[in-house]
Amino acid sequence: MKTVSQLIDMKQKQTKISMVTAYDFPSAKQVEAAGIDMILVGDSLGMTVLGYESTVQVTLADMIHHGRAVRRGAPNTFVVVDMPIGAVGISMTQDLNHALKLYQETSANAIKAEGAHITPFIEKATAIGIPVVAHLGLTPQSVGVMGYKLQGATKEAAEQLILDAKNVEQAGAVALVLEAIPNDLAEEISKHLTIPVIGIGAGKGTDGQVLVYHDMLNYGVEHKAKFVKQFADFSVGVDGLKQYDQEVKSGAFPSEEYTYKKKIMNEVNNND
C-alpha cells in the first residue's frame, strides 16, 4: 500500500499517479488487481450506483457503507473517501466528528473534502491525525450554484485557484484533486505545490489522473464528460442478460451441464 510520503516521492520523481473512483467490493478488487495507486470512494456514487439525481442526496451513512466495501475489496491500496455534502460546514465540532467517524469506520487512508472555504477544517482535521485530500475547480457538491462547466477560465478565477491551492496545501492537505480546469493552469499549480495534484479533466500536466470506474469501462452510464476515455466496454453484459432471458424462456437453460446429477425422488417415494 502506498503511503502519503511515497505518493509525494512519486511526484518528486515525476512518476505519474493513477487513481480510480470505485464504490464497491468487486470493483475495488479489480482496481487493486490492476495495480492502480489510489482509489477514491466518491460521492458520485449517488448518481452512478444509487440512482440519485446528484450528490446532494448522498449521506454520511452512504459513504461509510461503500467505503467499508471498497476497503474490504482493496486492503492494500491507498483509499480516499469523500465527505458528502453537509458533513463539512455546519460547525467545526460537528465537522470533525463527521470526519473522524468516516475515517475510523471505513479504515480509509484519507478523507476528501471540497472547496476553498474548508482550510480551517483541513487544519483542525490534520491536527487530530486525519489526512485530508482537498478538491478544487469543479466541485460536484456545488454544481447547483456553479453548474457543470470549466472552472478557472478567466484571469481572476485562475489567480484565485492558484491562491486556493496554496492555501489548502499550507493548511495541511496531503493531496489535491483539480477538476475541469484549463490544462496550463493545472500544470502551473502542480509545479508550485509539494503535495501530489491529481487531475480529472485538467490535462496531463498534473501529477496523476483520476477517472470513475463506471465511466472508463462504460458500465451503466449514459452520459460521459469530454475528459472521459473508454478503456473497455462493460455494456456488452446486456447481451449476456438477453441471452439468459431467451434461454430461460426456451428451456435451454439450465442444461445437464448446469444441473446436479444426484437423484433423490426414488428414495423419497420408497419411504411411502
UniProtKB/Swiss-Prot annotation:
Mg(2+) binds at residues 43, 82, 114. The keyword Iron-sulfur does not apply. GO terms for cellular component: cytoplasm. 3-methyl-2-oxobutanoate binds at residues 43-44, 82, 112. It is found in: Cytoplasm. Pfam families: Pantoate_transf (PF02548). Disulfide bonds: none annotated. It catalyses: 3-methyl-2-oxobutanoate + (6R)-5,10-methylene-5,6,7,8-tetrahydrofolate + H2O = 2-dehydropantoate + (6S)-5,6,7,8-tetrahydrofolate. GO terms for biological process: pantothenate biosynthetic process. Binds 1 Mg(2+) ion per subunit. Its cofactor is Mg(2+). The keyword Cytoplasm applies. The active site is at residue 179. Gene3D superfamilies: Phosphoenolpyruvate-binding domains. One of its GO terms (molecular function) is magnesium ion binding. Its EC number is 2.1.2.11. Pathway: Cofactor biosynthesis; (R)-pantothenate biosynthesis; (R)-pantoate from 3-methyl-2-oxobutanoate: step 1/2. Keywords: Cytoplasm, Magnesium, Metal-binding, Pantothenate biosynthesis, Transferase. Belongs to the PanB family. NCBIfam families: panB, PRK00311.1. Homodecamer; pentamer of dimers. Catalyzes the reversible reaction in which hydroxymethyl group from 5,10-methylenetetrahydrofolate is transferred onto alpha-ketoisovalerate to form ketopantoate. This is 3-methyl-2-oxobutanoate hydroxymethyltransferase. The lineage of its organism: Bacteria, Bacillati, Bacillota, Bacilli, Bacillales. The gene is panB.
